[in-house]
Structure formats: structure tokens, C-alpha cells
Amino acid sequence: MWSVMGLVRRTAMSSTVNKASPVRSLLGGFRCLNVESKEEDEKKDMTVLEAKKLMRLVNVEDMKKKLIGMGDKEMVTYTTLIEASQGLGIARSLDEAHAFARVLDDAGVILIFRDKVYLHPHKVVDLIRKAVPLGLNPDDELIREEFDKMRSMKEEIDVLAHQQVRKILWGGLGYSVVQIGIFVRLTFWEFSWDVMEPITFFTTATGIIVGYAYFLMTSRDPTYQDFMKRLFLSRQRKLLKSHKFDAERFKELENKWKITSCSSSSCHANASIRNRVGVDLDLEDSLQSHHRD
């Protein structure tokens, strides 16, 4: 940093001397020299300020990376931030540490309030937004109406997809019960265990092979939860296509609405179906499935 400052000063001083010489020789007085030197000093000061600003911006970016280590904390004390900036070598003195803290606060990287430093300012803004409702402009009102309409339509599609998935799962349970009943009947009434043992063995081995094939195709563990999620997304994709639902437009409206007035999890479009199905679903899964069609 000091090498850059010294280079700027030397450049400005050399330009001052070079430009002051012809003024002295032509006018033969010191008044013009003083005026010229003043202008050059102002230019030099502006250049130094610009260099300081540039170096501060570089330190802000460096401090952003260093603060990732504190990312698991919501808030630290101001003293902790000052000690961290000095310990990381970003600030050489206490005054520089205070200056860097002000720069971080001005840049919106952190929020300094009294003796507390909030490392996630956007969360503080969300809390204030929920506590103090903001008025909507006409454009936001149109966005809200369109978003509510599409969200209601998507909730109906999700409920219908969930009902179809439940029917399929209950059908699978019925198939398993009937299969076991048939094996019991054949083992103890029609045939004997010597005859049914190979049949049950190969049936179980077939189930294991199917689970392994599922893992190879999906790169996921063959769990009932994952199978239910994929089955739900498959039914949801078909219903979205049949109802001509624009998932990309809905995602855009959801992002705008979350930014303008809604930040809680209950405002997300997948909150109701997540509570009903018990599976963590994301609209991006629906978009990716929709693009594969």
C-alpha cells in the first residue's frame, strides 16, 4: 500500500517540477509558480485520495473473504471485529482497524449498531420488514395478484399430485401384502418350504438388484423417502404440463415477491406441500424436470 502511495507522490511531484519550470521562465515571477503549484497539489491530493479509496476497496474484498470464517455467527462484538482485522494483518494499527470497520459498514458487508456487529445485514432487514410492513406500489400489487393466482393453481396441482402418489404407495403396500399372503399359502398349504425357499430367495435377490439399479441410475440411496420425492416430482411434472403452468414465470414472481414484501418461509410456494408431504421440495426440481420433457 505504501509503495503505491509513494509512487503516486513521486509521479505527482515530478509532474509539478516539470510543469513549474516553464511557468517560471516565461513569467519570471513566483506568483504564477504558486498558482501552478497549488493546482498540481490539488491534483496530487485527488490522486492520493483515489489511491486510498482503491486500496480500501481491495481491503473490503479481502475482509469479505476473511469474514467467511465467522459466517456461522450472527453477531460479534465491535472489539472482536477490530481484533480480527488486526490479527489477520488487514489493519496495521488501531486507527486503520476502525477505518476498515467503517468502510465495511458503508459497503453493506456488515451492520454496526452500538457495540454490536451484525455479520448478516440482510437478515436484520428481513426482521425489520416483518415488524414494519411496507406499502406496496401499483406494480407490486400486480405482482402480488399474479403470484397469488399462480400459487393457488400450483397448490391445487401439488395436492392432486400428492393424492396420486399416495394411491401408488398404497397400491405398492397392497401388492406386498398379497405377495406375502400367496407365499404363505403356497408354503404351508400347496407346496412345502423346500419348494418355496428358492422362489423366495430369488424374489428377495430381485428386489436387491432393483434397488442397486435405482442407485446406479439416480446416484441416490434407494430409500422410501427419495422414491416418494421422485414419484411426486414425476406426477407433478405431468400435471404442470397438462395444466400449461409456466413454472419459470412462477419462479420469477416468487423471487420478486420475496424481495419486495415477503421473506418468511410461510410465503414460499412449497411451504404447504412440504408440510403435507413431509419431503423437502424445491421449485428448481420441478423446473429441471419440466425442462427434461
UniProtKB/Swiss-Prot annotation:
InterPro entries: MCU_C, MCU_fam. It is a multi-pass membrane protein. One of its GO terms (molecular function) is calcium channel activity. One of its GO terms (cellular component) is mitochondrial inner membrane. It is found in: Mitochondrion inner membrane. Keywords: Calcium, Calcium channel, Calcium transport, Ion channel, Ion transport, Membrane, Metal-binding, Mitochondrion, Mitochondrion inner membrane, Transit peptide, Transmembrane, Transmembrane helix, Transport. GO terms for biological process: calcium import into the mitochondrion; mitochondrial calcium ion homeostasis. Residues 1-33 form a transit peptide. It catalyses: Ca(2+)(in) = Ca(2+)(out). A motif (Selectivity filter) lies at residues 193-201. Ca(2+) binds at E197. Its main location: mitochondrion. Belongs to the MCU (TC 1.A.77) family. Mitochondrial inner membrane calcium uniporter that mediates calcium uptake into mitochondria. Constitutes a pore-forming and calcium-conducting subunit. Mitochondrial calcium homeostasis plays key roles in cellular physiology and regulates cell bioenergetics, cytoplasmic calcium signals and activation of cell death pathways. This is Calcium uniporter protein 2, mitochondrial. It comes from Arabidopsis thaliana.
